[in-house]
Amino acid sequence: MWKITVFLSIVWALSLLYGEWFAFLMPSLWSCSWPHLHRQSSLMNGVDYSSSYVKVAVITDPQLMDRTSLHLPPKSLALELAQFYTDVYMRRAFLSSILPFNPDIILFLGDYFDGGPILSDEEWQESWGRFRHIFDLNMLQQSANVKVYYLDGNHDIGYAAFNSRKPEVTRRYEKEFGARNYRFTLGRVNFIAVDAQTLDGNLQSNITSATWNFVRNVSKDVDSTPRVLLTHIPLYRTDSTSCGPHRSSPVINQRISRAAHDQDILYQNYVTEKSTDELLDLIRPVLVLSGHDHDQCTITHMSKYGAVSEHTVGTVSWQQGNLYPSFMLLSAINFTLPEGSSAEDAISTHLCFLPVQLFIYICVHFPEAW
């Protein structure tokens, strides 16, 4: 009997070790890799692999839990436990699943705190401290090898009807995370970050007009350099559009709500069709990256300049309605493409999945309790 007990104890200990540690190493050891490593050698044109791409890790929708998440009393034990387990999961995922890939860039696509727009300054700063700890921002800021870029989401500044009336929320966000509309270059690829929450707002508001002025200024210097459009809210698609094989939940159709008095946006899950068409025509991206939906989705838009792929990256949190949290690895070319190559050859992506925390609890921790 004691042999069976010892055997079961060893099996349980190994299962616990796998669920709490080794499972988070699987993406870097086995299931995921930088997409440029699989590109045809003919594209390399004699350039060394190690220096010919900028490596970008894309993360979205951590939505750190707070008093707005589960309607639990602030500082209650239940809320503290929920925060602890979600924070621990994301920190393990970041340190053990994402950082081992040694990315040059960390790109966040928005929604950092669940109740970001309505938290008090004290609560917001507390969430900011947790965010910095989870994603080890102090270490990243001290490293000369990793740069971090941020995109704002609706859980950061609210939708247009909110942030146009609460400019202090936007200022608070910008103080720590930086500008909402900006551009940057990685290798030979331009990235255009747009504040999607303001795109469909009242055109008379300063915050919406500022976003569109930025987009139009960007459109004035379009050249042959490939562009990636970054938008927290996904672009428009017709209802029931397939999201591809990585989707784990039903597709959500277009939903939009406007204020009666000024038609400002109260809620939306996609950018409107009009704004989508204008963005694609003015910016002319070869790729769009988005978040917001919490689940994975890949679709193709047809613009007047050709087909454009959009990847909606799933949430990195296990508590945001997606059993299969994910992140994305993106390789941006850092050399001149051979003649005859398309702009799409400059960018490649690979979706990577994180451990299913619920399965770990069921298979490892529940037997422990028994």
Pin down the residues of each PLM region.
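Active-site glycine-centered loops adjacent to acidic/histidine catalytic or metal-binding residues
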Residues: 61, 110-111, 153-154, 232, ...
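Proline-aspartate-enriched helix->loop->beta-strand connector
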Residues: 95-107, 280, 284-290, 295
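Structural motif
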Residues: 54-56, 105, 189-191, 226-228, ...
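Short active-site segment of divalent metal-dependent hydrolases/proteases
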Residues: 64, 113-114, 156, 235, ...
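Extended active-site neighborhood of metal-dependent phosphoesterases/phosphodiesterases
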Residues: 26-46, 76-77, 81, 115-228, ...
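Short, solvent-exposed loop/turn elements at domain surfaces
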Residues: 64-70, 201-202, 319-321
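N-terminal active-site segment of His-dependent metallophosphoesterases
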Residues: 1-125, 130, 136
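Binuclear metal-dependent phosphoesterase catalytic core
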Residues: 2-45, 180, 184, 257-267, ...
